């Protein structure tokens, strides 16, 4: 009845001339070498995205020298962190109402971020605050300028940290914005000819997110022996990220265009699980064995989603990001409020689906 699958995206490694000659330690941040001590080492970290900003402030305390190689600066905003009082802890423990109020505050605070995302002209006010945050935390003005992105905030993933920028005030940390020319046995040479000796190279370069790439290692066969990677060759598409035409009984969580740039993905997953359970119940009650989204329903949905995405900061912010495929199509993000997604998926419309007595049954049967 139901195919459950998990696809592990691949680590993204930059390719640099001479990497195969390097004699030091090399690893990706997702495959951290915990048995390898960085204490007293000269370390190069490539990348300044969501992975890198988490470990850079921590390893800077232990290493002899840290070189942070930045291709593109990232917008980083303050982390809303505080200590909870004993009174608050007691209320959380005893009062369900108090927990619900707190959860609602967090939810609606995050949900409000949709407004500047869909109306990029409003984002400039938030961007001014982010620029002030950089200036406040980074002492050197020239360095602060290098750490300031040249695209509209929100075009790439907005990062959250109170520790990242202050790290560059340390004497043992150097921001390197020159491109890498070559990696030698014990050093890195940048395009300006400068050579920096290193003992360890860490890739904080993220992951491969385009399904057309990572599905090369995964086989899912649908109607007429079509593989999912073939069906998605021109860009991943589905119906609310849950079902894909020509693939009966293939239920997905966090499928195409249901990743978020503003709120908790758990909310989306909960909505999807509820919807999938309704689909399974619909099949069981019908006495059939398979269910499939009608092609015209999926096509209409995706046309609407792509139209909504065009005016967002993700598409019009002046950058390229993992949100988009190489051709610029945004296959990742949900373009509006999560409560709208919840409302749309709260109840299945049976008219949108084909009920079949077997997965291979033709539409006309």
Feature-to-residue mapping (PLM):
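Short hydrophobic core segments
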Residues: 1-8, 43-46, 66, 180, ...
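Rossmann-like dinucleotide-binding core of oxidoreductases
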Residues: 7-141, 173-174, 196, 227, ...
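C-terminal active-site-capping segments
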Residues: 267-270, 274-365
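Central helical "cap/lid" subdomain
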Residues: 13-26, 189-241
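A conserved short coil-to-beta-strand element within the FAD-binding core of flavoproteins
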Residues: 32-35, 171-191
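Active-site proximal loops enriched in glycine and acidic residues that flank catalytic Cys/His/Asp
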Residues: 70, 177-179, 200, 205-206, ...
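Short beta-strand to alpha-helix junction loop
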Residues: 117-126, 152-163
């Amino acid at each position: 009845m139901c195919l459950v699958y998990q696809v592990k995206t691949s680590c993204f490694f930059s390719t640099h001339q001479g990497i195969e000659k390097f004699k030091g330690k090399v690893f990706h941040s997702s495959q951290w070498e915990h048995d390898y001590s960085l204490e007293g080492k000269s370390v190069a970290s490539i990348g300044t995205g969501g992975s890198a900003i988490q470990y850079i402030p921590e390893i800077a305390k232990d290493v002899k020298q840290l070189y942070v190689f930045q291709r593109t600066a990232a917008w980083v905003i303050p982390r809303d962190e505080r200590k909870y009082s004993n009174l608050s802890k007691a209320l959380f423990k005893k009062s369900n109402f108090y927990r619900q109020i707190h959860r609602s505050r967090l939810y609606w605070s995050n949900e409000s971020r949709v407004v500047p995302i869909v109306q990029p002209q409003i984002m400039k006010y938030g961007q001014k605050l982010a620029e002030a945050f950089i200036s406040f935390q980074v002492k050197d003005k020239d360095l602060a300028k290098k750490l300031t992105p040249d695209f509209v905030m929100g075009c790439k993933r907005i990062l959250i940290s109170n520790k990242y920028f202050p790290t560059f005030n340390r004497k043992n940390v150097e921001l390197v914005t020159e491109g890498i020319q070559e990696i030698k046995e014990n050093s890195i040479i940048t395009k300006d000819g400068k050579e920096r000796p290193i003992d360890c190279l860490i890739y904080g370069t993220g992951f491969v997110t385009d399904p057309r790439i990572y599905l090369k290692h995964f086989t899912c066969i649908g109607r007429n022996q079509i593989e999912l990677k073939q069906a998605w060759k021109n860009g991943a598409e589905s119906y609310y990220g849950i079902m894909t035409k020509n693939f009966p009984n293939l239920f997905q969580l966090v499928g195409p265009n249901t990743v978020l740039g503003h709120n908790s993905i758990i909310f989306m997953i909960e909505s999807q699980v509820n919807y999938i359970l309704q689909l399974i119940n619909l099949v069981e009650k019908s006495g059939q064995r398979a269910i499939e989204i009608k092609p015209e329903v999926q096509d209409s949905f995706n046309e609407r989603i792509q139209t909504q995405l065009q005016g967002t900061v993700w598409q019009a912010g002046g950058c390229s990001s993992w949100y988009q495929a190489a051709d610029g199509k945004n296959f990742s993000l949900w373009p509006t409020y999560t409560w709208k997604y919840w409302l749309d998926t709260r109840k299945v419309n049976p008219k949108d689906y084909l009920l079949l007595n077997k997965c291979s049954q033709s539409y006309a049967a």
